[in-house]
């Protein structure tokens, strides 16, 4: 026998995505590809797409958490752009980050200037003073 063939060779391990290795849901491979194709720099390190995917996943989870709370407050089970708008504008840090962003169909925050509200009557205070 010539010793060739497939006996005794190591079986190739099952492929594991970089996202699963990092414990992320966002696609590390796709982020890496987009960083390379985007002409941001000549070279892209191995850790950069993992870090960026983790940051994007965290921000998305944070916004969806707050939007889900806004939807629940409005007794709705589906998140709509209005809920995203309320979630972002009511959170100080997210509002600062996304200050210049317009959300389609988001509406505005309910706000009435204090000057426009009806004045409280002070009839009982004057009666006590006399």
Swiss-Prot record:
Residues 7-19 have a biased composition (Basic residues). The modification N6-succinyllysine is found at residues 10, 96. Keywords: Acetylation, Chromosome, Citrullination, DNA-binding, Hydroxylation, Isopeptide bond, Methylation, Nucleosome core, Nucleus, Phosphoprotein, Ubl conjugation. Deiminated on Arg-4 in granulocytes upon calcium entry. Monoubiquitination of Lys-120 (H2AK119Ub) by RING1, TRIM37 and RNF2/RING2 complex gives a specific tag for epigenetic transcriptional repression and participates in X chromosome inactivation of female mammals. It is involved in the initiation of both imprinted and random X inactivation. Ubiquitinated H2A is enriched in inactive X chromosome chromatin. Ubiquitination of H2A functions downstream of methylation of 'Lys-27' of histone H3 (H3K27me). H2AK119Ub by RNF2/RING2 can also be induced by ultraviolet and may be involved in DNA repair. GO terms for molecular function: DNA binding; protein heterodimerization activity; structural constituent of chromatin. The modification N6-crotonyllysine is found at residues 37, 119-120, 126. The modification N5-methylglutamine is found at residue 105. The modification Phosphoserine is found at residue 2. The modification Symmetric dimethylarginine is found at residue 4. Pfam families: Histone, Histone_H2A_C. The modification N6-(beta-hydroxybutyryl)lysine is found at residues 10, 14, 37, 96, 119. The modification N6-(2-hydroxyisobutyryl)lysine is found at residues 6, 10, 37, 75-76, 96, 119. One of its GO terms (cellular component) is nucleus. InterPro entries: Histone-fold, Histone_H2A, Histone_H2A/H2B/H3, Histone_H2A_C, Histone_H2A_CS. The modification N6-lactoyllysine is found at residue 10. The nucleosome is a histone octamer containing two molecules each of H2A, H2B, H3 and H4 assembled in one H3-H4 heterotetramer and two H2A-H2B heterodimers. The octamer wraps approximately 147 bp of DNA. Core component of nucleosome. Nucleosomes wrap and compact DNA into chromatin, limiting DNA accessibility to the cellular machineries which require DNA as a template. Histones thereby play a central role in transcription regulation, DNA repair, DNA replication and chromosomal stability. DNA accessibility is regulated via a complex set of post-translational modifications of histones, also called histone code, and nucleosome remodeling. Belongs to the histone H2A family. This is Histone H2A type 1-D. The lineage of its organism: Eukaryota, Metazoa, Chordata, Craniata, Vertebrata. The gene is H2AC7.
